[in-house]
């Protein structure tokens, strides 16, 4: 067993935190004797349903009491009291770099994701574009754990394991899914403009999907500005 208690950091955004779940749940189940602590923001903490018993979720209030350098120092101290002996940074932004600084100062082993920023810049460059397959976020998340000594085979199936979700949770929104019907969720907006698919094209995508028989479209993610 490589470590007894591992801190996992992914503060935002919601979709990126959601993408950690298949990897995190798989690692937790592969190493039941290790406790994993997921550090994320409150809104994202609600994603971790039916979690493995050895996964604990801790909320970071980065816009409140954990804001700024001093706030992050207090956050690092709070987490340190949980007897963390290794850190898996799945975010690699300024906030997590500050946290990593404190953990390294205290002699705690740290592993950080390689986001492949250089490769992505080469792929999206207007000139001298380098066309080559890039590793997925799932692969990059997994590599962080492997670097800490956690070898595992991804075995995540669903948040509901082999079953399905409770239809009663959305009974006020729509009728139960009928046999042969396909449900497609579309979240057209993002916090960063560069991550938003052009709205005119997205409208075309939704329009074409809605014309297919036995397809129901669900739109998600609109804030106040988008609703206007």
Give names to the regions the model predicted:
Residues 1-228:
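Catalytic machinery of carbohydrate-active enzymes
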